[in-house]
Amino acid sequence: MNVLSCSINTLKGLYDISGVEVGQHFYWQIGGFQVHGQVLITSWVVIAILLGSATIAVRNPQTIPTGGQNFFEYVLEFIRDVSKTQIGEEYGPWVPFIGTMFLFIFVSNWSGALLPWKIIQLPHGELAAPTNDINTTVALALLTSVAYFYAGLTKRGLGYFGKYIQPTPILLPINILEDFTKPLSLSFRLFGNILADELVVVVLVSLVPLVVPIPVMLLGLFTSGIQALIFATLAAAYIGESMEGHH
């Protein structure tokens, strides 16, 4: 009976944890709309970290970069390489967009593991990585969709819509459906991976609070970085595809 009682209490504790992470939110009323306040708070923190780091690193630019300037120039070169590989020679105007997506998602993902969000108490819910909320990932995916539609229409005009009947008009429904599945796959892939990683860490910490969670947290940091790279790479690939006019 003691074992059964202990198991029930453990399951109840895990249920309470998952309820806090998934089902409860801290809402704000803004202009008649109800928004997730904790997502705005953590998103502003991530944006402040990015802007503050960039400002400090490049406030005194040097011809031969060192320290923070060298790091940010390396990151910029990396983003340029990703953009050029996926988009082609006309990648230049899209580097800021791809870079913003990559850096925001990367820092958001890592903030879930590295920043002590849990010590900040809210009336409802808890603070967590912005990408832990489906609203954030859907918004990023929709921005990507708008970007590749804009890229295609800017480059090819109304001829862009001709892709829906290529290589045969029979594929029209499938080609239209593809444009709806792209943002769905982008948003749910990112959301699912980040949410699952945070829940696994919370569960392990509650059960075995000392050594076991550390390797999982390190693996989570690695996969979080990979997810940011995947999202940015796919966004660039979709933009390049819309500009080229073929799949």
From Swiss-Prot:
Alphabetical list of SUPFAM superfamilies matching this protein? F1F0 ATP synthase subunit A (SSF81336)
Membrane spanning residue stretches = 38-58, 95-115, 134-154, 199-219, 220-240
Record's GO cellular component terms: chloroplast thylakoid membrane; plasma membrane; proton-transporting ATP synthase complex
Q: How does it assemble?
A: F-type ATPases have 2 components, CF(1) - the catalytic core - and CF(0) - the membrane proton channel. CF(1) has five subunits: alpha(3), beta(3), gamma(1), delta(1), epsilon(1). CF(0) has four main subunits: a, b, b' and c.
User: PANTHER family in the record, alphabetically?
Assistant: ATP SYNTHASE SUBUNIT A, CHLOROPLASTIC
Q: Does the keyword Chloroplast feature in the UniProt annotation?
A: yes
Write down the species. Solanum lycopersicum
Fetch the PROSITE patterns from UniProt: ATPASE_A (PS00449)
Superkingdom as given in the UniProt entry:
Eukaryota
- Family as reported in the entry's similarity comment: Belongs to the ATPase A chain family.
* Protein name per its UniProtKB record: ATP synthase subunit a, chloroplastic
Q: Name a Pfam family for this protein.
A: ATP-synt_A
How does the record say this protein sits in the membrane? Answer: Multi-pass membrane protein
UniProt-annotated location(s)? Plastid, Chloroplast thylakoid membrane
